[in-house]
Each structure stands twice: as C-alpha cells, then as structure tokens.
Amino acid sequence: MSARGGPLARLEARITREWQRRGALAWALTPFACVFGLCAALRRTAYTQGWKQPVDVGVPVVVVGNVTVGGTGKTPTVIALVDALRAAGFTPGVVSRGYGANVQAPTAVTAASRASAAGDEPLLIARRTGAPVWVCPDRVAAAQALRAAHPEVDVIVSDDGLQHYRLARTVELVVFDHRLGGNGFLLPAGPLREPLSRHRDATLVNDPYSGALPPWPDTYALALTPGAAWHLDQPTLRRPLSQFANERVLAAAGIGAPERFFATLRAAGLAPATRALPDHYAFADNPFVDDAVDAILITEKDAVKLGASWRDARLWVVPVEAALDPRLIALVVEKLRGRSPA
C-alpha cells in the first residue's frame, strides 16, 4: 500500500530534508540567515544587557523549548515534567501560545475545551495532566491570568517560548530529536532559530534510532515510549500494539516530525503504511475514507482535534510517555528551590 500525503506535507518533508545538508539551496539562503541571526541576536541582547526588562510573574518559570523548527518531543516532555514537579511537592501550571487556535487574549484550557479554541498541544496537556493551562500569544499575560485564577500555583511550565524573552524564567530546557541542529544553519538556510551554542540549563535529546548523545554539557537522554492504543470512540477499549501486527494498518500523523511516530511503531514490530499530514492538521474532513485498512493509528495530538462527529471505527490512538532522567528532575527542582527568576 502506498503512502500518500498532501502537497503541504510533501513540501514540509522536502524542506526538512534540505535542512539536513549543506546543499546549494542552503548556501543560497545564507545571506537571509545572516539577517535573521542578527535580528534574533539583537532581540536577545536587549534583554540580556538590560535594555529591556523581562517580566517576573511572581513564581519560578521553567521553559521547555527548542532552538530548531519542528517537533522534537516538547509536549510529552512538558507532561512528564508537570507530573515530576507535582511528585516533588510543587503545584504546577502551564502556559502556551495556543498555536493553531484563534486566541487573542488569555484563555483557560480545560479537558472540555475544543482544539480550535485552545490549540491541540495545550488541550492534550490539560487532559493528560489536569493542571491549570492558559494560552495566549503573550505568554506573560497568560502566566499572569493563570496566577490570578489559580493562586495556589507555585511554578509555571512554559510549553515552548524559549525565544519569548519578555517572560522571566528560572530554568531553560532545550529539546532535540535525532536531527539535532540539522545542517547547523539559521533560518531559512537551516532549521535553527538560534545558534546551537545558545545557553540553556539542560539539553534533552530524543533519539529513537541510535540513542547516542552529543558531547554537550548537561545533556540527558529523553525516552519516548508508546503505550497500549485506545479506541477513539471507546477510550476504555485498549489493545497492545503487538495485536496490530497481523492487520492492515495505516499510521497517520499531523505532527512536526511524523517519521518519528512511524519509527516508534516499527520499533514495536509493526509494518504500517504511513501518511504524513501537515503539522497541526485541522481534520476538517476524514482523509482516510478511501483507505482499505483494518486499523488507523494516530497520535494523541491529532486525536484531540477529532470531535464527536468522527465515527470511523478503525481509529486507534497511540499514547506516548516521556521518561525523564532522575538527574534532570533533581537539577530542575534544585534550581527552582534555590534561585529566583532572572
């Protein structure tokens, strides 16, 4: 069975491939990358040199972000971090931009929210953690609104926002996948939003292929493990992935790095046909109606966008759990208890 994807998904895949090598296109775009890098450096310098002051929202902030474009595993990392902080005695809340949603003002996200109004990632975080989640393009405003509504919150986790320097932060965690920094060039010649040398408190690397870690200081492995699939229409109905081995399976993902999801399924012993959808795919209609398969495996991030009108009995959702290194958790807790936002 051949894999299909829309033009946008194919374009995203082409750009991603180009960003992994220093080909003619990358070199042709380096003048634009220099301009991008200068603008980014000036913006960061404005805060590091005191020309602009970051806003202290009154509690420590942990930023989980990346210096590259595309998915690296931030959302499961945020979920695992919220659980770890709660286990350490904190009362965490989460702020996010709400990418993909029409959000202009600080908005609370609950398990009953719609992805179109909250964003798929914040909605998934709210459902998985039960923590207070607020979204707004202005993360400072989101954090202030969260604190006003939930004064019991004593630490805020920012889902992405590494480059949102206006929000004062106590800890910065940068997440990479196996692609690391790609060709090492800044946008648009490469995938980097900032240089790889950018300071951070710790680096997490999610590499399902080799498991190797780069020789960077304070670097920890990030393991993402799939759980038993649950049925979209009957969430209490669960099946181990091994039970799909002898069925005709299509794996579909509208995430930043769909190939990583497909690799996870292959590592579990499946050989699915694959469908890469554009990141934050809206699922305005069912793209699977013509697929002659027994089961369709999708990500949790995609599942939150499928409402009650979806009645495709073939849809199964594969949850992913992030395992954080205990040393990383200890590092974060130590910094939260011993340092004020800066």
From Swiss-Prot:
Q: Name one GO biological process term.
A: lipid A biosynthetic process
MF terms per GO, please?
ATP binding; tetraacyldisaccharide 4'-kinase activity
One GO cellular component assignment for this chain's record is: plasma membrane
Classification via InterPro entries: LpxK, P-loop_NTPase
HAMAP family under this entry? LpxK
Source organism, top-level taxon? Bacteria
**Which Pfam families does the record associate with it?**
LpxK (PF02606)
**Pathway, according to UniProt?**
Glycolipid biosynthesis; lipid IV(A) biosynthesis; lipid IV(A) from (3R)-3-hydroxytetradecanoyl-[acyl-carrier-protein] and UDP-N-acetyl-alpha-D-glucosamine: step 6/6
What EC number(s) does its UniProt record assign? 2.7.1.130
Task: Relate the protein's function as given in its record.
Answer: Transfers the gamma-phosphate of ATP to the 4'-position of a tetraacyldisaccharide 1-phosphate intermediate (termed DS-1-P) to form tetraacyldisaccharide 1,4'-bis-phosphate (lipid IVA).
Q: Which organism is it from?
A: Burkholderia vietnamiensis (strain G4 / LMG 22486) (Burkholderia cepacia (strain R1808))
Please list the reactions this protein catalyses: a lipid A disaccharide + ATP = a lipid IVA + ADP + H(+)
Q: What is this protein called?
A: Tetraacyldisaccharide 4'-kinase
Q: What class of enzyme is it?
A: transferase
What cystine pairs are annotated?
Answer: none
- Residues bound to ATP: T68, V69, G70, G71, T72, G73, K74, T75
- Family the entry assigns: Belongs to the LpxK family.
Write out the entry's keywords from A to Z. ATP-binding, Kinase, Lipid A biosynthesis, Lipid biosynthesis, Lipid metabolism, Nucleotide-binding, Transferase
